[in-house]
């Protein structure tokens, strides 16, 4: 019969196995295991080859929750179907970037967009209006319609740095889109992290973020955070299970290490904490 000490050690080893860790360290924060609904990492694929996707998934799959095929890259990607099938072979949810959705909408090809997703077996879809103006009721109607075909993510915020949205409006838009059927709302930042919830310098608009969190559940927001300092801010504010997006593929292990206090920037976050 196992003593309590041995039982706890066995449980720790089992947890390591489930979370794809290689050895035991005490005082490591608990990451929600996959498949998870919060603590998500969304990767932005801006043009990986099929071989690079294989290599990336071989190390990244345990730590990645969703992959976005960035902006309109899907239109010009060679062997797109085969590339998508590689991701799908790892049971990895993928979706076309919101800019591609907008490209279909502005050309009055919304039904073609639905067919595109169906043809490629895509069951995650992003609705955004960062490049074009869509009346918000119409945007919410798109969200509701797409829920018939899969999981919808909707992006709030403009790609135009001169278009400043006040905090109350961010909250209003996010609430309406969640009510329309979005599973998550994405806080816009672009791949550079210099618009939307950030200033042009990349600095977080802290007042905006904290006001949003007074009304919108943290587990329903994916914060685009391509820069390390931005990721660190949200880890400090919300914790290791914050949803982060627009992460570069080659940063996945670095981010996961920082989430759990194994990078210099977050080294002391969880020591002496259970």
Language-model regions: role of each:
Residues 23-27, 210-274:
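C-terminal alpha-helical cap/extension of soluble enzyme domains
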Residues 19-86:
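Conserved N-terminal beta1-alpha1 strand-loop-helix module at the mouth
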Residues 39-50, 70-73, 95-108, 156-169:
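Active-site mouth loops of central-metabolism enzymes
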Residues 74-86, 104-111, 131-150, 164, ...:
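Active-site-adjacent beta->alpha loops and helix N-cap segments on the catalytic face
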Residues 54-62, 78-91, 112-120, 141-149, ...:
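Acidic (Asp/Glu)-rich catalytic clusters
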């Amino acid at each position: 019969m196992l003593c309590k000490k041995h039982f706890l050690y066995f449980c720790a080893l089992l947890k390591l196995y489930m979370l794809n860790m290689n050895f035991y360290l005490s005082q490591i924060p608990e990451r929600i295991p996959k498949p998870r609904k919060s603590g998500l990492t969304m990767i932005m694929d801006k043009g990986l080859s099929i071989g690079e996707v294989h290599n990336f998934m071989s190390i990244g799959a345990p730590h990645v929750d969703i992959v976005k095929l960035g902006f309109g890259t899907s239109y010009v990607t060679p062997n797109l179907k085969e590339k998508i099938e590689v991701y799908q072979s790892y049971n990895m949810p993928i979706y076309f970037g919101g800019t591609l959705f907008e490209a279909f909408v502005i050309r009055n090809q919304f039904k073609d967009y639905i067919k595109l997703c169906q043809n490629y077996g895509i069951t995650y879809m992003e609705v955004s209006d960062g490049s074009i103006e869509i009346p918000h009721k119409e945007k919410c109607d798109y969200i509701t319609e797409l829920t018939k075909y899969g999981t919808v993510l909707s992006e709030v915020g403009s790609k135009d740095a001169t278009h400043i949205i006040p905090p109350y409006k961010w909250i209003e838009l996010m609430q309406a889109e969640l009510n329309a059927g979005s599973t998550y709302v994405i806080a816009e930042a672009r791949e550079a992290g210099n618009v939307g919830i950030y200033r042009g310098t990349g600095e977080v608009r802290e007042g905006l973020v904290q006001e949003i969190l007074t009304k919108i559940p943290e587990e329903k927001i994916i914060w685009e955070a391509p820069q390390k300092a931005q990721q660190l801010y949200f880890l400090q504010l919300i914790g290791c299970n914050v949803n982060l997006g627009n992460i570069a593929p080659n940063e996945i292990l670095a981010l996961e290490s920082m989430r759990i206090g194994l990078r210099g920037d977050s080294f002391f976050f969880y020591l002496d904490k259970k």
